[in-house]
Amino acid sequence: MDSQSVAPVVLVILDGWGYRDALDGNAVLAAETPVLDSLWAAYPHTLLQASGRAVGLPAGQMGNSEVGHLTLGAGRVVPQELVRISDAIETGSLFQDPLLMQVCRQLRERGGRFHFVGLCSEGGVHSHIDHLYGLLKLAAQAEIPAYVHAITDGRDTLPRDGARVLAALEKELQWLGNGVIATLSGRYYAMDRDRRWERTQKAYEIMTQDGPGRGQSAAEVMEAFYAQDLTDEFIPPTRLAPGAVQPGDAVLFFNFRPDRARQLTQAFVCPDFSGFQRPLLPALTFITMTQYEADLPVQVLFKPQNLNHLLGQVVSEAGLKQLRIAETEKYAHVTYFFNGGIEQPFPGEDRILVQSPLVTTYDQAPEMSAVEVTDKAIEAIARREYSLVVLNYANPDMVGHTGNYEATIRALETVDRCLGRLLAAVVDAGGTTLILADHGNAELMWDENGNPWTAHTTNPVPCILVEGERRKIPGCGGDVKLRSNGTLADVAPTLLEILGLPQPPEMTGRSLLQPAEYTILQRQPSPVGR
């Protein structure tokens, strides 16, 4: 091996691979995962908290991929948008926001209407229904007609929870005496992020083309779709009442997570949009709850938080090269989210995007593109030029979301086989690998009543360190342990220690590494897999 070649430090993120002792509904324990099982038995390991306050969310709130990757890359607990927005509503500062005050004033002057587009869900991953309630209260106080274009969930919530949520929303609208639910659309259509423009087009057209309504309540329409075996995620775009977005109106997209809100927003606002043919609505005021993309011609209600000295930035400033690699479904997570919401790569940061399979749901292709991601990563590692490699395997999360137990087992087994190949390449390069997950999912596939569980969980996630010959941990004498009570915020400091780089003061996480002689003997957790 060339003495000048680089021995990489590789961060492998098993998206949605949570830890849970119980066997019932646990695809992780049901899957044959000999690689991970042997690693857990032979190498330093621990469990990390990946939900709630450990990642800047309310206590008891399940983690998610965006929050997980942001925390991993930041090396600190970052107050999440869910908390920022909820606090603004609770304190009343949202109702005094200058942007909202100006928009309400303009709508009153020109007789415009206020449209609220977003995921009507209690999941707290992309949005929260309480935020919509706050916005509807604002519109009612300003005496501006409100129209809700409800996107139904079924992924971060139970598959048939939408009827209950929308029935409560209709009661809230009646109590306010202002507003109607104009349209429904499952997130499968309205929140696609894989450039399946035919889905986005159906959602866009139901929101912008007027016509007669169904003459039924939202809950009644949902129950009718349930009878056709269509769950919340897959509700076809449907008009409940006249109320299309028109020139002179205002739209507020109240999702706070950007990745699944971008395509629909682009269709509304981009003059050079090419996803499908549509007229650009003139004189339309478009507001997004958070910044979805740096150059979108929209107004942003909650501006991005400025985070400095992120992991990628520290590695870049040290003059080291790094690589981010994932398939389409998780590409934004290892790039945009991992970099703290920064679109552009840092100097010396290369990126590889592998196309996800073009299927309706990923239980139809549980292998997804894991093999291709692994092939590309092995090729890159063989070049011996990257000091840090960040790789995401999407399968456990994306297939777990389908609720298909057998397909999720196949997804996990695929990842395990790919991990074996990847580790062989890292070992050959003398590198060190840190394997972990960003949140739970696949370890819980049905609830206590036997119904499919398609959401994330609050369970901890496994973390395994595979130390390489040319990346021995400084100061540990070749014998290192991972401490307990860690969180995702501790991962970036850990990687910096392995790389031999100083931890910046902005990173408040603590390295998970400790010499074996300083480790207090503790009960070992049970294995990751079978």
Curated annotation (Swiss-Prot):
Role, per record: Catalyzes the interconversion of 2-phosphoglycerate and 3-phosphoglycerate.
Gene3D superfamilies reported in the protein's UniProt record: Alkaline Phosphatase, subunit A (3.40.720.10), BPG-independent phosphoglycerate mutase, domain B (3.40.1450.10)
The name this protein goes by in its record: 2,3-bisphosphoglycerate-independent phosphoglycerate mutase
GO CC terms in record: cytosol
Record gene name: gpmI
Catalytic activity annotation: (2R)-2-phosphoglycerate = (2R)-3-phosphoglycerate
Pathway of action: Carbohydrate degradation; glycolysis; pyruvate from D-glyceraldehyde 3-phosphate: step 3/5
Cofactor: binding comment: Binds 2 manganese ions per subunit.
Species assigned in the record: Synechococcus sp. (strain JA-2-3B'a(2-13))
Family: Belongs to the BPG-independent phosphoglycerate mutase family.
InterPro entries in the record: Alkaline_phosphatase_core_sf (IPR017850), BPG-indep_PGM_N (IPR011258), Metalloenzyme (IPR006124), PGAM_B_sf (IPR036646), Pgm_bpd_ind (IPR005995)
Gene Ontology terms: biological process: glucose catabolic process; glycolytic process
Active site residues according to the UniProt entry: 65 (phosphoserine intermediate)
Binding-site positions, Mn(2+) 2: 15, 65, 438-439
Keywords: Glycolysis, Isomerase, Manganese, Metal-binding
List of residues binding substrate: 126, 155-156, 187, 193, 257-260, 330
Top-rank EC class of the record's enzyme: isomerase
Binding-site positions, Mn(2+) 1: 397, 401, 456
Record has Manganese as a keyword: yes
Enzyme Commission no: 5.4.2.12
Entry GO MF terms: manganese ion binding; phosphoglycerate mutase activity
